[in-house]
Amino acid sequence: MAIDRYDFILALYLARYAGLRIHECFRIDTATVERALRENAITVKGKGGKVRTVPINEQIAIAMRKQLERTPRGHKLLVSDDMPTDRAINHLQFFIMKHRDEVRDVDSDRPMTFHGLRHTYAAEKYQELINNGKSPLDAHFEVSRLLGHERPDVTNIYLASVGKGDKHEQ
């Protein structure tokens, strides 16, 4: 399936395990990845130019190293020089559409999407924070920060799969 598509693997891992938006992934260059590997966290510029730093796990680090080996220094990691960014994004989205049934959770009837991976990250991160002793309010604000959102109502959309009484309501 994606055996040699380390670019796609990395983008999917960044959504699933770090909550990055698709455009944030496709802006990443080699210098950003080198710093992320040193700091175990990636700094991205999100919507409205807001900068945030998100921790990366070992799966992301491994995928970053593999893609870094294939990318000339000073270049974008997920976009080749001869391809516009929007076309590279479309290729990833087509790949997801073509292979989503092979990787979909058996318990889910919803089709996998890139943005859906971000939702999964948010819900799991929230639950992890709660399990580690954070209050629902503190966990909600931490997930908001990690996603690059400030408004509680937007974060609530991401946390819709979490039980009603378990998340901060506006």
What are these regions, as identified by a protein language model?
Residues 1-18, 22:
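Basic, Lys/Arg- and aromatic-enriched nucleic-acid-binding interface segment
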Residues 7, 21, 52, 64-65, ...:
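Short, cationic motifs built from Arg/Lys/His that form the positively charged side of catalytic pockets
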Residues 2, 33-38, 101-106, 129-137:
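Alpha-helix termini
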Residues 27-64:
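Conserved tyrosine-mediated DNA breakage-rejoining catalytic core shared by Y-recombinases
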Residues 40-44, 113, 138-170:
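Short functional hotspots where side chains directly engage DNA or cofactors
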Residues 57-128:
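Active-site/catalytic core of tyrosine-dependent DNA strand-transfer enzymes
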Residues 13, 118-153, 157:
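C-terminal catalytic core of tyrosine-transesterase DNA break-rejoin enzymes
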Residues 3-7, 117, 138:
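Alpha-helix N-cap/N′ positions at the starts of helices
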